[in-house]
Amino acid sequence: MERYEVLEQIGKGSFGSALLVRHKQERKKYVLKKIRLARQSDRARRSAHQEMELISTVRNPFVVEYKDSWVEKGCYVCIVIGYCQGGDMTDTIKRACGVHFPEEKLCQWLVQLLMALDYLHSNHILHRDVKCSNIFLTKEQDIRLGDFGLAKILTSDDLTSSVVGTPSYMCPELLADIPYGSKSDIWSLGCCMYEMAAHKPPFKASDVQTLITKIHKLIMDPIPAMYSGSFRGLIKSMLRKNPELRPSANELLNHPHLQPYISMVYMKLESPRRSTFPLQFSERDATLKERRRSSFSNDRRLNPSVSDTEAGSVSSSGKASPTPMFNGRKVSEVTVGVVREEIVPQRQEEAKKQSGAARTPRVAGTSAKASTQRTVFKHELMKVSNPTERRRRVSLPLVVENPYTYESDITALCSLNSPDVSVNTPRFDKIAEFPEDIFQNQNRETASRREVARHSFSSPPCPPHGEDNSNGSITKDKCTVQKRSVSEVKQRRFDTSSYQQRAEALEGLLEFSAKLLQQERYDELGVLLKPFGAERVSSRETAIWLTKSFKEASV
């Protein structure tokens, strides 16, 4: 527990509480789930320990990330899992205020949930509590299935008979006290998809007996007609009364209606877009990444058809995520070829026309669609490009000799078009809400103008022949150049050890912060004050210098 800093309590229930914590070294937010053991039944204690052991073995991109777990003083089971900023699906439906989600979004969520359930069922794990409040969303609106408190590892007969779960999501065989298996999770998923589409649960009643009757007789309102017949048919197939007639997660993933969305989900898995650079690297991680890249390059040279997934690509967090499987094959083997046949010719023509532009590294301004297509067709782009130029993966922003060393990432940071500040400070140049006049002089200055400015500052211009320049007056243009050079020299000569200059800069920082606060621009204010942490390197001097530059540039 000493490795984490408690931020706030985000949930509380009869068995424990959920706390938002921050890892002190990683500076990353997690959720600490504390399950109380005192004054609980033996079954509840066993369930808590089982959840801790079970979730530590689960590794899937669409299941909540497991970080750590321990038993605290014999009174609490503590489980640290990944924090999903998007909240749960129940809150997402409430925030929609009756506005239906697009079918494309629902299909993407369905595919991600099916991949999570297929992974669990293939490992003989029953979730047994699939409901909207246990489906979480990341900041990018991706699914994470959580809460394994009622999960169970199946026995050899693949059936269980315990009556657990939420009544509104219980399958008919469970209510009839008939042994059930993985098809019970499919029923619960069908109820969730119905609720996502209709913004209300399929079976709802004021008392339990009426609810059971509605479930047994399948009494529910029709799914909104705005969705296609194929999509509505998928949901209805998951809500069949006979479990033998319900499709499995593997069979649903092979449905023709979901194939395009499987391709989209897999391409997003294969090439995650990174918006930040890691500030710290360990030598061990760098060595492993370098070996993996070297092995992957050798495999691709021997066999150009080798995909990133077969070579074992990793996400930006550094942990390998298992490739979703269905029908005995990897998703890449089933779907990527279909998309490639449709739009390869168009991409090859564009690559030939823009071969020069493709070699220029781009950091911002690319759309998600372009980034995704570039990921799928990186093999084709390599064929039409110059064979002598160095190749790079699209998830990296720059072409470097050794992409996985600490020095190369510093080189990538230095080559970005950003203010001359420490790499530990926030990226002010990426904040679109700042006024344009702050960076106007810096972006428009060229090397020739800087040279003229330096000369004009070091040696005053000679007066024209026949004119008396004893009063020191110069033309308007020359005065402007001289003013720029003075500001530039002041920025270069700013001494952080000077108390007077530090006081002036701090005063400017307070004025600038007060201005942001008055305009209710809290995001920019938070980014401006973020460098003042004790763990940063020269953060105060860097922030003072940067604020003084802003103040002088706005004069």
Curated annotation (Swiss-Prot):
Keywords: ATP-binding, Kinase, Nucleotide-binding, Serine/threonine-protein kinase, Transferase
GO-annotated molecular function: ATP binding; protein serine kinase activity; protein serine/threonine kinase activity
Compositional bias segments (type: Polar residues): 304-320
E.C. no: 2.7.11.1
Family annotation (InterPro entries): Kinase-like_dom_sf (IPR011009), NEK_Ser/Thr_kinase (IPR050660), Prot_kinase_dom (IPR000719), Protein_kinase_ATP_BS (IPR017441), Ser/Thr_kinase_AS (IPR008271)
Residues annotated for ATP binding in this entry: I10, G11, K12, G13, S14, F15, G16, S17, A18, K33
Region (Disordered): 288-328, 346-372, 443-477
Record's keyword annotation contains Phosphoprotein: no
All residue ranges annotated as the Protein kinase domain in the record: 4-258
Catalytic activity: L-seryl-[protein] + ATP = O-phospho-L-seryl-[protein] + ADP + H(+); L-threonyl-[protein] + ATP = O-phospho-L-threonyl-[protein] + ADP + H(+)
Active-site residues (renumbered): D129 (proton acceptor)
Family: Belongs to the protein kinase superfamily. NEK Ser/Thr protein kinase family. NIMA subfamily.
Function: May be involved in plant development processes.
Record PANTHER family: SERINE/THREONINE-PROTEIN KINASE NEK, SERINE_THREONINE-PROTEIN KINASE NEK4
The protein, known as: Serine/threonine-protein kinase Nek4
Species the sequence originates in: Arabidopsis thaliana (Mouse-ear cress)
UniProt gene name: NEK4
